[in-house]
Every structure is written in structure tokens, then in C-alpha cells.
Curated annotation (Swiss-Prot):
NCBIfam families: dGTP_triPase, PRK01286.1-1, PRK01286.1-3. CDD domains: HDc. PANTHER family: DEOXYGUANOSINETRIPHOSPHATE TRIPHOSPHOHYDROLASE-LIKE PROTEIN, DEOXYNUCLEOSIDE TRIPHOSPHATE TRIPHOSPHOHYDROLASE. This is Deoxyguanosinetriphosphate triphosphohydrolase-like protein. One of its GO terms (molecular function) is dGTPase activity. Residues 62-198 form the HD domain. Keywords: Hydrolase.
Length: 396
């Protein structure tokens, strides 16, 4: 049953280009389908978060992460009486703007773009769905509903000035009310993202042998999860014990968000989606106690996983790839693909616009393509050793 504070697909604020409605799908379902069928979504298969693609097929990619986020987001939306399709849509779209090599790639591209308006993956996601996807006859982008665009832009909360240039450009023709909070559906998608990455970073870190289950069993929340498993399944083998404990950890996070959200909703008694946006605070969030426990876990992961020697070495290598490719294309835009060269011709002589085109191009690369592009354009041998301003070995 749809709650009074849920977004109503039949009362959407519409699309930038008016289209005939579908007889079989709601506006939010059409948004979801357009995202799934987009080029940017397919490329997430070969974009990673912590481990570069070649390090193993087992580790999460942006695509598998987005699917996990969508699954838990939809479940929580159903429990809270929200529109499941809008929630799923924002969840599937939330990582579209990430460049290759995860947060390392974004850090590198952000530094390079600082003189030209900066780089932000949420703003880039909005740019992708409003401009860079060019497949439809009547419009650039995907022509998504206002509610989906709002969710992409501010699922993490209100956006204050100065705005990233990509967000400012995308919002030039549509007012997404950036000073307010997003819908409850978008807020659920944001918390689902937090739940998914906290869970799978622990899982991937164990798989990479960066820490042990004994170490995890001493951390907040996880201590109770392992104890519950040991009590119910004494003598359980290592892999099943690990899985059961992390499964319980996942459940604890979901239940905390739902309980906290129900309490907040009871307090403010919202009667419309606008009441959620104008509440002045996020309605969907972790409880203070659990959030503090998660900070302890994130500190542990930062030290033991994100700053592990093997990961730091990888970060240095892939940072160099982005730092090499960006000036190369600035100086040699003729090496861009044909469709991108047309954009360069349209901004002839404008250094800032050229940099933004190069940024758009690099941010759309997958890990694999960026490495291959670097090897082909900057230099490298068939054995995987990439040469140029630095010597990088990406191995097998």
C-alpha cells in the first residue's frame, strides 16, 4: 500500500521533452528500463570500486554493486510504503558517473579538472542521463522524470554552492530544488548504497586476505553477529560461518534503518512527498548508535583495506594512467573518437570546454579500456608493461 508521503508516478512533475505515456509501464518503470538499457549502465560491468578489474573476477564491480543496492533499496521501499520503482531507479543510476578505477580514478580526475570546474560523480551521473547518452531521435540523454533526476542529483542530501559545473549545466533548464532534501525513495537508495558497500567491502577484504574473520569478530555489530552464528551453529566451517555472520550484519543494518525511519515518520507525520523534502533533515538514516559503530568499522577498513600496501600500489599506478591520458587528449584531441571530435570542433578555442569534453570521455572509460588506451597511446609492450611518464606493470 502506497504511503501518503510516497512519490506518485501518476503525479510526476514530468519530463523535459513531453512523451506519450506507456500503456504498460509507469513513468518510473520507464526510467528504470532506460537506465538499464543505457550504454553507461553496461559499462559499469568493467568498472571497479577498490580492486582493479584484472585482480580477480570475484570482486565486486560497479554493476554488481548497483544491482545489490537496487535489491536492498526495493525491499526497504516496500517495507516503508514507498514507490519501489522510483527507489530502484535511483539505486541503479547512483554510480553511473564514476570514472574508471573507482574512487582513485575520481580523485585523479577531480584534481585534473579543478581549474575547469571540478569533477563530481553524482553531477556526472546527471550529465550522462541529461546529455551524454545520445541514442534517441527526439532528445539527448534519457529524458527521465523530474523525480528520478532529483534523486540522482541529491540522494545524499541538499547540494550547496558552489555547484560542480556538470550539475550546474544539467540544472540550467530544470529546477531540481537542490537546497531541499530528496524524496524518501532517493533517501532509501542512498542508505541502501551505504549498507551494500559496508557489507561487500568486508566480504571482498576477507576474500583478498587483507584481514581475518577473527579480526572482524572483534568489531562492533560484527561481534554479536559472529556470536549468534557460533551459538546456533557450533563447529560450522570457516566459509559458512563467515557468510552467516556477514548475512546477519547486513540484516542488522537494514532493520536499523527501517526502525529509525518509522520513528522519524511517526514524529513528523508527513502527508505528502513534499513534506519529506521540506522536513529539514533526512528521514531515512541510521540510528546514532549504529552510525557510530559503522564509523569504527569504516576506520578499520580504511587502515586494513583501502590503505593496504597492495591497494596503495595499485592506486599509484592507475592514478598515473588518468594523469597521463588527460593532458594527452587536451594536447591531441584528434585522437578522440569521431563523435567526440565533433564536440571539440563545436568549442574550438575554448580550453575549459575542451577539458570538460576530455573529462566526459575519460570518465566513461572502463578500467580495461583505460589501461588499453594508455598502452596504445602513451606507450607499452605486449607483456602488460605500460611505459611513458612512468613505468606501470598491471600484470595478469
Amino acid at each position: 500500500m502506497r504511503a501518503a508521503y510516497a512519490c506518485d508516478p501518476m503525479a510526476t512533475r514530468g519530463r523535459a521533452v513531453v512523451e506519450e505515456e506507456s500503456a504498460h509501464r509507469s513513468p518510473f518503470q520507464r526510467d528504470r528500463d532506460r537506465i538499464i538499457h543505457s550504454s553507461a549502465f553496461r559499462r559499469l560491468k568493467h568498472k571497479t570500486q577498490v580492486f582493479v578489474e584484472h585482480e580477480g573476477d570475484y570482486f565486486r564491480t560497479r554493476l554488481t554493486h548497483s544491482l545489490e543496492v537496487a535489491q536492498v533499496a526495493r525491499t526497504m521501499a516496500r517495507a516503508l510504503g514507498l514507490d519501489e520503482d522510483l527507489t530502484e531507479t535511483v539505486a541503479l543510476a547512483h554510480d553511473l558517473g564514476h570514472p574508471p578505477f573507482g574512487h582513485t580514478g575520481e580523485d585523479a580526475l577531480s584534481a585534473l579538472m579543478a581549474p575547469y570546474g571540478g569533477y563530481d560523480h553524482n553531477a556526472q551521473a546527471l550529465r550522462i542521463v541529461t546529455h551524454l547518452e545520445r541514442h534517441y531521435a527526439e532528445f539527448d540523454g534519457l529524458n527521465l522524470t523530474w523525480e528520478t533526476l532529483e534523486g540522482i542529483a541529491k540522494h545524499n542530501g541538499p547540494v550547496a554552492a558552489p555547484l560542480p559545473w556538470a550539475l550546474e549545466a544539467s540544472c540550467a533548464d530544470i529546477n531540481l530544488e537542490l537546497s531541499t532534501h530528496a524524496s524518501a525513495e532517493a533517501q532509501v537508495a542512498a542508505l541502501a548504497d551505504d549498507i551494500a558497500y559496508n557489507h561487500h567491502d568486508l566480504h571482498d577484504g576477507l576474500r583478498a586476505e587483507l584481514f581475518s574473520t577473527d579480526e572482524l569478530a572483534g568489531l562492533p555489530i560484527l561481534k554479536g553477529c559472529f556470536a549468534a552464528v557460533d551459538q546456533r551453529y557450533p563447529g560450522l566451517n570457516y566459509y559458512r560461518r563467515r557468510h552467516e555472520a556477514l548475512r546477519r550484519f547486513f540484516g542488522v543494518l537494514v532493520e536499523d534503518v527501517l526502525a529509525n525511519a518509522r520513528a522519524a515518520l511517526a514524529e513528523i507525520n508527513p502527508q505528502s512527498a513534499m513534506d519529506i523534502r521540506n522536513a529539514g533533515r533526512p528521514i531515512i538514516r541510521f540510528s546514532n548508535g549504529l552510525f557510530a559503530d559503522l564509523q569504527v568499522i569504516r576506520t578499520f577498513l580504511f587502515k586494513r583495506m583501502y590503505r593496504a600496501p597492495s591497494v596503495v600500489e595499485m592506486r599509484t599506478q592507475v592514478t598515473q594512467v588518468v594523469e597521463d591520458l588527460f593532458p594527452f587528449f587536451l594536447e591531441t584531441p584528434s585522437e578522440l573518437p569521431r563523435q567526440w571530435r565533433k564536440d571539440v570542433e563545436d568549442v574550438a578555442g575554448d580550453a575549459t570546454q575542451l577539458a570538460r569534453i576530455v573529462s566526459d570521455y575519460i570518465s566513461g572509460m572502463t578500467d580495461r579500456f583505460a589501461l588499453q588506451c594508455h598502452q596504445r597511446l602513451i606507450g607499452g609492450a605486449q607483456d602488460g608493461t605500460v611505459t611513458g611518464p612512468s613505468t606501470l606493470n598491471f600484470g595478469a
